[in-house]
Amino acid sequence: MQVSSHVLADEALAGSPKDLSDQAWEVNLRKQNFQDREIIVGKAQNILELKAPFRAEDATIVPVSILTKISQTKDRYIKKIHIYIDNNPLPLVGQFEFTPDSGKADIAVRVRVNASSYIRAIAELNTGELYMSKSFVQAKGACSAPPPASMAESVKSLGKIKMKVVGLVKMGEPNLMQVKMRHPNLTGLAPLKAGSSIIPPAFYVDTFEVVYNDKLIVKAYLTYAISMDPTLRFYFVPEKEGEMTVTGTDTNEGKFSSTYMISAWKPNHS
């Protein structure tokens, strides 16, 4: 099969999926959200690294991990991490706020990727510096895909929160915590069943707050780009035994909360 030179020229003019994603970022998203502030990227930065699979097995639950390379000290720490997916209908995935009590500003979530795109993480330090890492993911159709049959269980258990420490609890050191909230996280862009013309409005978890012994660990502002049953991994530093409280809200003014006792000797299960 021969391809005309006109088609090849048009494709070259349009650019590769990576080029188009970069254009969407530079022309729109970067200026809208960070104006003319300098963002340090590539080999010039050694603050964070975003990891995601190059090819999504399931575009509705793409795992994204952000690894940070500096300690959270009172003098210098990552204050916010912004996550964007350039080619999603709503590019912002979420904004995550941290404190020195986080120990590390690492974060892991599962996201919906609607079309092949770069996923970007921008770390904003308390000093005002901005650093970016990105990873390209091949995917399509996540935001407009009907939810899986398991959504019924999410609706039935709406707002139920499970928490666990990953590994042994170590006082005075960063400990990895996992939180999962049952919620359908509807995008407002897809019918509940394939072939249906009825599209329910967006309905998703929009805030997530974690407090340990009355100290803020992480607060998140989220969009429907977060997958069904939002799962969040993060760090915290327990100086002593105490209580972790997780609170979430959704776009229907729902509010959900759960507590978990942290002790050095307690088996680590919710």
Language model features with spans:
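Short acidic/polar inter-strand loop motif in beta-rich domains
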Residues: 125-133, 249-259
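Short edge beta-strand/loop segments characteristic of extracellular beta-sandwich folds
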Residues: 51, 63-72, 176-184, 192-198
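Aromatic sugar-binding surface patches on proteins
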Residues: 100-108, 224-233
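N-terminal export signals
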Residues: 1-8
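Beta-strand signatures of extracellular beta-sandwich domains
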Residues: 80-84, 207-211, 247
